[in-house]
Amino acid sequence: MRTRDTTLLTPWIISFWVQTSALFASFHNQNRLSASSTGANDRLIGIVGDRRIMSEPSPIAPAEGKLGILTPGMGAVATTFIAGVLAARKGYAAPTGSLTQQSHIRLGKRDEHRNPLIKDFVPLASLDDLEFGGWDPYSDDAYAAAMKAGVLEPRHIEGIGEELRMIKPMPAVFSPRWVRNLDGTDQVKPETTHVDQATALMEDIDRFRADKQVDRVVAVWCGSTEAYEEPSDVHIDLDVFEQGLKNNDEAITPSQIYAYACLKMGVPFANGAPNLIVDIPAMVELASREGVPIAGKDFKTGQTLMKTMIAPGLKARMLGINGWFSTNILGNRDGEVLDDPESFRSKEVSKLGVLEHILQPDVYPELYGDIYHKVRINYYPPKGDDKEGWDHIDIFGWLGYPMQIKLDFLCKDSILAAPLVLDLALFMDLATRAGKSGIQEWLSFYFKSPQHAESIHPENDLFIQLTKLKNNLRHMMGEDLITHLGTEYYDES
């Protein structure tokens, strides 16, 4: 019997084993790539230095024709987003804060110096090809709504005033049971049953497609925070949910009716609020059945954005935390809605969950096992959209000596949220054309409470989220994934 001499293979095997071991250690500590970040069916075919080489992805359909963006809710966030895109199209202002428009992405090895803009690397819809629509319980057109919101100065709105006036919201599915503290709503759909409301929304989507002559449509929730709700029996699976629509089940919310209508019409849906929407089993099932992407939830903008920057740094240096007190002052419509205790509860749950998964108190009980974490939101009308987020953090270091961090972030809530709406719309459209469906965890970068598979915890570290997002883009385009191992620059062979 002939035997094969494997002597020449031994160095290669050892090298491959060493690099693989180092790679997995690196992933565990810093670049934990879940199945959703590379695709559950992707096959690892090799590792070269700090690059993870995967099997070829599916082709991406080109971004031909127009993309329609529907926003349930056309208040401060939606109109700031729309006005910003229109201004950028005319060259009046830059789309600052948008990864799709301004961020570069590294490709290959560092010494190759390949760093294209994301929008030049992946086939995204052009800003010139976007059309806008949406629903709102107030009948103000986008111009009037933007002026009332007071986010943008009139001089920034007037140059695009004609286009804004042409964007009129469709009558909304709305219930004061789920969104309180809003008075004077003047265009609510007359349909009284859930199934009729869903049908009316689907007809709206069809009409929007025809009127705007768009080839594709995505939806991004920009509406108000609904009262807190735990999943109930009607949310367990799609058949039960659809029966609940027919029976007018009181546990089905307006936002869930929007999501159902969109997914049934093949429209990807991203949830920018803490509402229970596409993160119920029934919607996950529907998205999978229809082959439509979903993502959520709750735009990560002001105070929570800062938390997901600061907490990873403290953890990286193994600095302990005794307490983290956060308070917010804001005076826009969002603040008015959140002045209701039940709506605030939805936001509180979303904001409180961030630190736990970053700090891992079960792994580091001596550092983070006894944190006192409190979040407060205060409605103060004079603030308008100029939100103030104040954080007091009690930390401890070497030998347990105490220290403090105080952060006062004076931000404009809608200015931070608007580029997220743009990026999510373009990336959800990209995901659709790339054949992706169901939960898009790679978009967790944009959310306070990222939607994820039931078997894993969410990833809230902003920097790991960005690595996940960019590696997904690299994989879509057949580029090597970046692991930051970097050993190939120091090989002594």
Task: Describe the predicted segments one by one.
Residues 19, 28-30:
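Low-complexity, intrinsically disordered or signal/transmembrane-proximal segments
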Residues 39, 46-49:
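Residue-identity detector for glycine
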Residues 55-265, 269, 281-285, 308-311, ...:
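Metallocofactor- and cofactor-centric catalytic cores in central/energy metabolism, strongly enriched
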Residues 243-251, 290-303:
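Acidic, His- and aromatic-enriched active-site or binding-groove loops in soluble protein domains
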Residues 269-273, 294-298, 322:
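Short catalytic-loop micro-motif centered on adjacent basic/acidic residues
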Residues 297, 301-365:
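Conserved anion/nucleotide-ligand pocket segment
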Residues 350-353, 357-441:
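Glycine-rich, aromatic-lined ligand/substrate-binding cores of catalytic
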